[in-house]
């Protein structure tokens, strides 16, 4: 019971960060597939054409 109560806030926070990171990665790959990318990790695909 104690661990559940204690870990709940940190679980929510880490879930938020994890989801944000996953969204960022999926956006990066989506843009890379479309031939444009605003993330340096895309390397030679790094560009932000609209």
From Swiss-Prot:
Keyword Repressor included in the entry's annotation: no
Keyword Oxidoreductase: no
Signal peptide: 1-7
Chain residues in the propeptide: 8-35
Tissues of expression: Expressed by the venom duct.
Any Pfam family matching the protein: Toxin_8
Coiled-coil ranges (or none): none
GO cellular component terms attached to this protein's record: extracellular region
Basic and acidic residues biased stretches: 14-26
Disulfide bonds: 37-42, 38-48
UniProt keyword annotations, A-Z: Amidation, Disulfide bond, Secreted, Signal, Toxin
Compositionally biased spans, kind Polar residues: 1-13
UniProt-recorded Gene Ontology molecular function terms: acetylcholine receptor inhibitor activity; toxin activity
InterPro entries hit by this protein: Conotoxin_a-typ (IPR009958)
Location of Cysteine amide modifications: 48
Description of its domains: The cysteine framework is I (CC-C-C). Alpha3/5 pattern.
Family the UniProt entry places it in: Belongs to the conotoxin A superfamily.
Further remarks about this protein from its record: Found in injectable (milked) (IV) venom.
Protein name, as recorded: Alpha-conotoxin CnIG
Organism: Conus consors
């Amino acid at each position: 019971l104690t661990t559940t109560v204690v870990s709940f806030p940190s679980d929510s926070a880490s879930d938020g960060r994890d989801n944000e990171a996953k969204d960022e990665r999926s956006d990066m790959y989506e843009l890379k597939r479309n031939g444009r990318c605003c993330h340096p990790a895309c390397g030679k695909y790094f560009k932000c054409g609209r």
